[in-house]
């Protein structure tokens, strides 16, 4: 069995991996995302995912597969990561409701067994429901949107306020499972090698 390391403290990403039989070692990268200033949204999330994975990979003494991810919501050309505070989350939801956005997740898989690195991008369209200010305030009061890129969790209460997903649902939660399978295959592995 291959050692699999998740370079993220995200409970949602860990749970996605566990749901497919991968029980990763979890390391938080503590990479300073503000140190990266890239205007292109696609390049930004891929670069951040790579940096997070590299920070963790450089700390490991033994070979492993290291997965780093970074997600943002792009709505009307603007990037939204995690909200700063409840007021920010409320303002975001007021601008997001009734709109469509793209959830971008950069994925980096570093193979320390073969000294190879793959960097990929998954994009999923998210159509948000039109919800009232009261619903927004109640949702933000749960605290859930404060821990999520785009201020919503598809696999939580936020799923109530998403009308449609076009593309990969697991990508919206934090990592694309189909893309991970493709990345493992490209490196010559099967997901079962990580079970």
Swiss-Prot record:
EC number from the UniProt entry: 3.6.1.9
GO BP: nucleotide metabolic process
Catalytic activity: a ribonucleoside 5'-triphosphate + H2O = a ribonucleoside 5'-phosphate + diphosphate + H(+); a 2'-deoxyribonucleoside 5'-triphosphate + H2O = a 2'-deoxyribonucleoside 5'-phosphate + diphosphate + H(+)
InterPro entries according to UniProt: ITPase-like_fam, Maf-like
Alphabetical keyword list: Cytoplasm, Hydrolase, Nucleotide metabolism
Cofactor requirements of the protein: a divalent metal cation
Primary enzyme class: hydrolase
Active site: 70
Gene3D superfamilies, per database record: 3.90.950.10
Subcellular location: Cytoplasm
Gene Ontology molecular function, alphabetical: nucleoside triphosphate diphosphatase activity
Annotated family: Belongs to the Maf family.
The protein's role, per its UniProt record: Nucleoside triphosphate pyrophosphatase. May have a dual role in cell division arrest and in preventing the incorporation of modified nucleotides into cellular nucleic acids.
Listed name of the protein: Nucleoside triphosphate pyrophosphatase
Organism (species): Cyanothece sp. (strain PCC 7425 / ATCC 29141)
């Amino acid at each position: 069995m291959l050692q699999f390391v998740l370079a993220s403290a995200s409970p949602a990403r860990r749970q996605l991996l566990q749901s497919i039989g991968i029980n990763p070692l979890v390391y938080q990268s503590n990479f300073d995302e503000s140190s990266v200033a890239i205007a292109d949204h696609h390049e930004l999330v891929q670069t951040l995912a790579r940096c997070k994975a590299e920070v963790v990979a450089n700390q490991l003494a033994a070979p492993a597969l290291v997965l780093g991810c970074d997600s943002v919501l792009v709505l009307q050309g603007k990037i939204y990561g995690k909200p700063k505070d409840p007021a920010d989350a409320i303002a975001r939801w007021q601008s997001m409701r009734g709109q469509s956005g793209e959830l971008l997740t950069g994925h980096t898989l570093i193979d320390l067994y073969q000294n190879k690195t793959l960097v990929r991008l998954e994009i999923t369209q998210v159509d948000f429901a039109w919800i009232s200010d009261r619903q927004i305030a109640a949702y933000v009061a749960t605290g859930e949107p404060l821990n999520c890129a785009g201020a919503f969790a598809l696999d939580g209460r936020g799923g109530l306020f998403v009308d449609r997903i076009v593309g990969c649902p697991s990508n919206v939660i934090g990592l694309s499972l189909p893309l991970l399978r493709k990345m493992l295959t490209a490196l010559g592995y099967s997901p079962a090698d990580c079970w």
